[in-house]
Regions:
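Conserved ATPase-coupling elements of RecA-like P-loop NTPase cores
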Residues: 72, 107-109, 203-218, 240, ...
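Conserved pre-motif I regulatory segment
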Residues: 2-35
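Conserved helix-turn-beta segment of the N-terminal RecA-like "Helicase ATP-binding" lobe
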Residues: 67-92, 109-118, 247
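Post-DEXD/H (motif II) to motif III coupling segment of the RecA-like Helicase ATP-binding lobe
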Residues: 208-268
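Conserved C-terminal RecA-like helicase domain
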Residues: 39-42, 94, 124-174, 182-186, ...
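Conserved RecA-like P-loop NTPase helicase motor core
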Residues: 106, 484-486, 501-506, 513-666, ...
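Conserved Walker A/P-loop ATP-binding site and its immediately adjacent core
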Residues: 40, 46-78, 99-105, 211, ...
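Long, largely alpha-helical accessory region at the distal end of helicase-like NTP-driven motors
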Residues: 296-355, 361, 648-909
Length: 967
């Protein structure tokens, strides 16, 4: 049997055949790299093996861990090649499956690097001083004290620089391959002697760091004819150097199949993304509140003048500094004052934060500064950070007085409590004790109990859960700041097992802790689980410090290679219905098709880690063809306290690039696919989070609905398009007013809405024109019998057509009509505009047809039109009803020669404001929707800039988010 004799016993799926076509295209073009992306469970291993078969000859497969190594060996055996594979180089075989670690082990290069760094330091100092290198070296040998400490620090920095050069292959005298340890060098030599022609890099997303540099050096020595990269999650968050390395190793992605496509085709289990929200326990909240008070005390203290010794000028007080910055509007170094509009355009965050602070403190903002709703909000944490950074760097850092230094240190200390660092360059974000408390809160294991109790109620004996944590047990005691608040097991897998075992609802699940160190459970489950694992311990051991007991046989080897398969088999059989493990062991490469519930308790937020963990639940279960997978996050929120939304923001980052069906069946990225109330910035209030938790219970039990939302077997385009989701900001509505009253119309196809919108615009023009006839004309009109009633009805009609918020469907219609008039949107695409209602008052606006580029035009323009643009070129107006002003009030305004309706200005979207003809095209479409309107260019006159400032100061009225939607 040879490599060419390998045969896949199944039938190739459509996307697998497309992957092979991409490979053949690469080979026909003479390319030596093939980069394929497919989700976990989609058969990447068999794809890679088929490419090895097609290429023929000796092959090397590199994998990140032993679990994936075992999968390759098993798959080769299923394809008839059991005798063709080796996992050690102790015998001849044409396919070698090794871990990256086996080839990437480096010797300790410390001595060699230090010697090179010493030589470079000597040469650089000799060049700077004009002395010979020998003289510099001799003098340095006698240095002691501070001089020697400085020299040692400089040499250490040079060592770090040389490490980077060696890793990148840029050092003239030292190659990375020279640093491989003896075993790695021998393996590389053996593989080269065997004539290795094909190298498969499985889970190649790991190669954007040190492994990548080492693998690049190894590949250079092997001189393989073909390199294949396989991954489910190409890394997206890369530095420039990492991106360059990854691109050099693998080249661009040749073929990618998105996870939703494989689910829609029926080859992965349909899944739903769910979340459970909890609040910190009372003791934890008290600790958080104390830190919140400290920050509030800092803010209060900043209102006091800084005392200063005689002869040293005191820095300005904080309010005086902010007032000066807002009034003078120069740089902190005293640069010339600039107009407010220019200042707001250059420093929008500082301008907004400054005005908010002044208004909240009862201080008058400078002339020209906006005073609208968006600026009347009290400063939030982000505003304070902007102001404190400007104050610390501009006022305090330049002042030599001890009092200024003390205040600078006080600001730094208060910020450190919240996880921020005040540096000479500004404020940097980091992980704080507040973050750690929220991620490790004792409320999370209790929430885990609720999640699995809910799932047990819905699934019964078919429940197979996997709970992923960052660590098995605490490696150290709780930090001093959290002593007495968090115990030693906080946030660990051990704590999760104990919580499940202590609750009567979840104890029957028999939670089993699986780590790279051991198998553990509570003493009460030891006998049953030992029997299920087919081990016969001599005695039940005593509980360890965590209160758990270890499961191990009485004799013989016992390693993860032994216990992970047994634990997986016990889960599959239902002897335990919950495995609790670490992300490192079970979060990637672990194959357990029975898993139908995944609970993510980790802090991981990168797209690579999140998608890998989700992949554990997506494989089809041969025993349960109707499997529905539920993936849960547990989030701890105290949003009313400083930094209390840190865990929520982590949750948002997890879901930013994760595609899943929302409650209406649209497959989208972002937290709103969990629930529409979950936005990308701040968490909902506590009452709304309770609503979300109730909705999660219902969705967890609605397996039929979950399957229906996926529409399995229906055709798809496999295209991602941006769409806009909006909801009126509740504070913008008058008492008793609904979203519909405020301007959100029912969702209708454009073919039905367009005539309504056009007629509405015309009616508004007539009504408004009549109402503006003036007091003399109106008085004469009122003398005619019935005319007063007619005028009142017309005014009522005008008010109804001029809501406080711009009509969403009208705004979207204006955008697509403008682009259609400019020839940039085909008519059939423009006519495919729909506004669809979601739950909780949200609406989704999208194009059913067209390219992603067409969708991006609508999404970007609508987001700007309904939001606030800091520096617009053109503004358009619309008449607006003032909430609470009825027909009589409007008539009274007309009699006083004042317009019955107010005027609200909106920024013309940037792309449509690039030239006058484009702005005019939008204005025509806009006027057809909202009625009488005016277009103004605002960047060349003081009046125009003032109008732009006024428009920016008005609250947007809509909460607008843009999401990627797959279809």
């Amino acid at each position: 049997v040879t490599v060419a004799d390998l045969r896949f016993p199944g039938t190739w799926r459509r996307y697998q055949e497309l992957a092979f076509a991409a490979f053949e295209a690469d080979r026909a073009a003479g390319r030596r790299r093939t980069h394929l992306v497919a989700p976990p469970g989609s058969g990447k291993t068999v794809i890679g093996l088929e490419l090895v078969r097609r290429r023929g000859g000796p092959a090397l497969v590199l994998v990140p861990n032993q679990a994936i190594q075992a999968q390759w060996v098993a798959q080769i055996g299923r394809c008839g090649g059991a005798g063709l594979v080796r996992t050690e180089l102790d015998r001849d075989a044409p396919i070698s499956v090794l871990t990256y670690q086996a080839l990437c082990r480096l010797e300790d290069p410390g001595a060699a690097l230090r010697e090179l760094a010493q030589a470079r330091w000597t040469a650089e100092r000799a060049a700077a001083t004009g002395e010979s290198e020998q003289a510099v070296a001799a003098a340095a040998a006698d240095w002691t004290g501070e001089a020697e400490r400085r020299r040692s620090a400089q040499v250490s920095r040079i060592v770090a620089a040389i490490k980077r050069e060696v890793a990148r292959g840029e050092h003239p005298d030292l190659a990375l391959a020279d640093l491989l340890d003896r075993g790695a060098r021998e393996r590389v030599a053996a593989l080269r002697a065997a004539g290795t022609a094909t190298v498969v890099l499985d889970e190649c997303h790991h190669l954007a760091s040190l492994w990548g540099y080492v693998v690049r050096a190894v590949l250079a020595q092997l001189d393989a004819e073909l390199v294949v990269g396989l991954t489910a999650t190409p890394p997206a968050e890369l530095t420039a150097a990492e991106g360059e390395l990854y691109e050099a190793l693998l080249g661009p992605v040749d073929f990618s199949v998105p996870t939703p496509a494989v689910v829609r085709d029926g080859f992965l289990a349909p899944y739903q993304e769910l979340a459970w929200f909890c609040a910190p326990l009372a003791s934890e909240r008290a600790w958080l509140a104390e830190h919140d008070v400290r920050f509030a005390e800092l803010v209060t203290a900043l209102h006091d003048e800084v005392p200063a010794p005689d002869g040293i000028p005191a820095p300005l007080s904080f309010p005086a500094w902010v007032l000066r910055r807002m009034r003078e509007r120069g740089a902190a170094d005293g640069a010339a004052e600039v107009p407010w509009g220019t200042f707001q355009r250059r420093r929008p965050a500082l301008a907004r934060a400054g005005v908010r602070f002044l208004l909240s403190a009862g201080l008058a903002p400078p002339p020209g500064a906006p005073r609208g709703e968006a600026f009347r909000e009290p400063p939030d944490l982000d505003d304070w950070l902007v102001l404190l950074e400007d104050y610390a760097l501009g006022a305090l850092a330049a002042d030599p007085s001890p009092a200024a230094a003390a205040r600078h240190e006080a600001i730094g200390a208060a910020l450190r409590d919240l996880g921020f660092t005040l540096t000479r360059q500004g404020i940097r974000r980091g992980r704080s004790e507040v973050d750690r408390l929220l991620t490790s809160s004792a409320a999370k294991p209790l929430a885990l109990v609720e999640v699995l109790a809910c799932e047990d109620e819905a699934r019964g004996e078919t429940l197979r859960a996997c709970v992923l944590c960052d660590a098995e047990r605490a490696e150290r005691r709780a930090d001093g700041a959290l002593t007495g608040v968090l115990d030693a097991t906080a946030g660990t897998a051990a704590r999760a097992v104990l919580a499940l075992a202590e609750d009567l609802r979840t104890a029957p699940l028999r939670p089993l802790l699986v780590s790279g160190r051991a198998l553990r459970c509570v003493p009460e489950d030891h006998e049953a689980l030992a029997a299920a694992l087919d081990i016969a311990p001599a005695v039940v051991p005593d509980p360890d410090a965590d209160g758990l007991v270890e499961l191990r046989p009485g004799a013989g080897p016992w390693t993860p290679r032994d216990w992970v398969p047994r634990a997986t088999a016990a889960l599959t059989a239902g002897h335990t219905r919950t495995l609790v493990g670490t992300r490192a062991l079970l979060g990637e490469g672990w194959d357990a098709p029975c898993v139908n519930v995944l609970v993510d308790l980790t802090v991981a937020t990168t797209g690579v880690s999140v998608r890998q963990m989700r992949g554990r639940s997506l494989r089809l279960d041969p025993q349960r063809p109707e499997k529905i997978a539920s993936n849960w996050d547990v989030v701890c929120v105290a949003a009313d306290l400083a930094r209390g939304a840190a865990d929520y923001r982590r949750f948002v980052r997890k879901h930013a690039h994760l595609l899943a069906p929302a409650e209406d069946g649209v497959i989208e990225a972002g937290p709103s696919h969990v629930h529409p109330l979950l936005g990308p910035f701040t968490p909902p209030v506590a009452a709304e989070l309770a609503v979300v938790d109730r909705a999660m219970r219902a969705r967890a039990a609605d397996h039929a609905g979950a399957r229906e939302r996926w529409a399995i077997g229906t055709p798809y385009e496999a295209v991602e398009r941006p769409t806009v989701t909006v909801r009126p900001v509740r504070e913008d509505l008058a008492a008793g007013e609904t979203a519909r009253d405020a301007g959100v119309q029912a969702a209708l196809p454009l073919s039905q809405r367009a005539p309504v919108l056009t007629a509405a615009g015309g009616a508004l023009a007539v009504a408004a024109g009549t109402a503006l006839a003036g007091p003399v004309g109106l008085a004469g009109l009122l003398a005619v019998p019935g005319a007063g009633l007619w005028a009142g009805l017309r005014l009522r009609r005008a008010a109804a057509l001029a809501p406080p918020l711009p009509p969403l469907d009208g705004a979207a219609h204006a955008v697509v009509e403008a682009y259609a008039a400019l020839g940039e949107l085909p008519r059939d695409v423009a006519d495919s505009l729909v506004v669809e209602p979601r739950s909780d008052g949200y609406l989704r606006c999208r194009l059913r047809r067209g390219t992603p580029e067409h969708a991006a035009l609508l999404a970007t323009a609508l987001e700007q039109l309904l939001g606030v643009v800091e520096s617009p070129r053109y503004l358009v107006s619309r008449p607006m009803r003032v909430p609470g002003r009825g027909p009589l009030g409007m008539l009274a305004r007309v009699l006083r020669r004042r317009p019955p309706l107010d005027e609200r200005w909106h920024a013309v979207p940037d792309d449509l404001a690039r030239r006058a003809d484009r702005a005019e095209a939008f204005h025509r479409a806009w006027s057809g929707v909202v009625g009488p309107s005016e277009l103004r260019f605002v960047q060349r006159s003081d009046a125009g800039r003032a109008l732009a400032v006024e428009a920016a100061g008005v609250a947007a009225g809509y909460e607008v988010t843009v999401r990627q939607v797959w279809s």
